[in-house]
Amino acid sequence: MTHAQANTTALAPWLELNLQQFPLEYADQLSSHLPMALHALHSLGADEARMAAFFKSYSRRFDGVPAPAAEPAARDWLGVRGDWSAYSALRSYFELALAAEGRDARLRRVLPDLLPGISAVAFHGAIRLAHAVQGGHAGELVAALAYWASRWQRLPAPPQNGAACLSLTAWSERLVAGAATWRSEAPNIFLRMLEASGRPLYAELAWVAPAPAPTLLARVAELASLALGYYLHSANFTVLHMITGLRAVRVLAPWLPQDKTFQIQAQEVLTQAFVAAYMAGRVQWREIPLTAAVATWAVLADAATLSEDDHAIKLVHACRDESAAYGDPRYLQAAAMALR
């Protein structure tokens, strides 16, 4: 039995304390990774002392910034979707809705309207929600839903040009080659994604993407494999978010509609976000020597729990999760790279 299985209640107090004390963002619209990293640390086996130390260390980023105050519930969440100032009203709304409907019914109701905004704050709306679902804390689930809804951002759909579909390999090669000649200087990932969505390469690749896969999960698996390969050849910070973002979609997929129309539309949205994120990454493609033999997951998990790097912690957790889902041994290499 793992540490996480043996002590399933150890995470809740830390998530609750975070909600009571800290905001959702800090500095220049940077998403707080504290609740996500806490869940990852717990899942990787961090003990109580390590959880406390990481919480104290990370909390310094919020110096002087209070947690959001409570507000009356929004009457129509879709009417204020994408309005950051409505976060507290959305949080009150989702708190009442979850109490009335339960988790599964509420997720099935709202996720179809949230997914088109998957690019929100560089996938962090979806990423935080996936961690919240797995963490099992009702308050964090409410906060994650409200965060995604208030920061909801949909990339523009490019005009259809009737181009033929490329194979997955050819499409990926065109993305890598085309993105190498474009660079944005916007400070945040999501701003660079927005800028990328106005470029001809985005329009081209969004419409010559491979034909729809049989299911959304099948397309997620294909894109996850590509993102993993990109990371192994770049160790790129934005590609890291593509890996954790795709993991989030896989975790949330059971609550998404299964009808063919939605599944195809969801693949289009995800493909557009994938293109924009890779372009936003300013990826420097290079041959990074891979270790012939790397440590086991147990060793990497232990190392991650001692890290102060919230992104490394989350990536090791995500890679272990994705390795279990897909059986791809390259995830072990990626996790080891994140801890170097």
Task: Please identify what each model-predicted range represents.
Residues 1-340:
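Mature, well-folded catalytic/scaffold domains that follow N-terminal targeting or propeptide regions
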